[in-house]
Design a protein with these regions (language model features):
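Positively charged n-region of N-terminal signal peptides that target proteins for export
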Residues: 1-4
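Sec-dependent N-terminal signal peptides
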Residues: 6-9
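N-terminal signal peptide c-region/cleavage motif recognized by signal peptidases
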Residues: 13-15
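Acidic, serine/threonine-rich low-complexity disordered tracts
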Residues: 19-103, 140-238
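Hydrophobic, well-structured mid-protein blocks that either form specific transmembrane helices
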Residues: 94-140
């Protein structure tokens, strides 16, 4: 019943783009508080020759690594995911996720840690990577809160966010004026915390992410350098 209700809500909550998408690439330092050294992360969005977009994220540290890639297209201002792949190794159990979004058959087909996944598909449903682009665009549009329907494991979950305000983030690229956003979770269900900062003057590029897991372990990425639409990101200097 709950899944059917969430699916029906997609008809009323289609993520739409505030502006034309801009390709970007960014490098980050990555810190896991439980490990003594920093790692690195790369995030990029590029448009392919056939018009589809590819969003890629890679992070590595010592023996741990994560790769995440989504492909999607834009149709009348709406994001339509096509494929999603995630591969995580180290730091406990590995994880592999594959999802294919079949818009002709209106279904999502894939696997999550070896278990088959099959879900109904309609416009408005996003994967765990593409929703980040929708959030980035909604923040650019000035929204103070936003919700997305996301394929999460073998279910469709609602991801809620709210804007906390503006904040200056000190990065290796300089001081960046950013909009601070947090993931809203039911504290009776999860004490996990996620906060994101998006650059106001650089296409609302993600400049910082801080996450606290349910076991108290912390993870953070912080911008080192990047480009938006081919222009190097340059913050203010002290």
């Amino acid at each position: 019943m709950r899944r059917a209700l969430l699916f029906a809500l997609t008809l009323f909550a289609l993520p739409a783009l505030a502006d034309e998408l801009q390709p970007f690439s960014a490098s980050y330092t990555a810190d896991w508080k439980q490990l003594p050294v920093s790692g690195s992360a790369e995030r990029s969005l590029k448009r392919e020759s056939d018009g589809r977009w590819t969003l890629n994220f890679e992070a590595s540290m010592l023996v741990a690594g994560l790769t995440e890639e989504s492909t999607f297209r834009v149709d009348n201002g709406a994001l339509l995911p096509l494929t999603y792949r995630l591969n995580r190794s180290g730091l406990g159990k590995g994880k592999k996720v594959e999802q294919d979004f079949d818009w002709e058959q209106k279904q999502v087909i894939g696997s999550d840690r070896g278990d088959a996944v099959r879900l109904p598909l309609n416009r408005g449903l996003l994967d765990k990577s593409t929703y980040q682009i929708a959030l980035q665009q909604d923040v650019a549009a000035g929204k103070k809160s936003a919700s997305y329907l996301v394929v999460d494991g073998d279910e469709i979950e609602t991801y809620d966010f709210r804007v906390l305000g503006e904040e200056v983030v000190r990065t290796k690229a300089g001081l960046i004026d950013a909009i601070k956003v947090e993931r809203v979770r039911d504290p009776t269900q999860s004490n996990r915390k996620t906060v994101l900062w998006f650059a106001k003057d650089w296409g609302h590029l993600l400049v910082r992410l801080h996450q606290v897991e349910t076991d108290g372990k912390e993870y953070q990425i912080m911008l080192k350098d990047g480009t938006v639409a081919g222009k190097a990101v340059e913050g203010r200097r002290d």
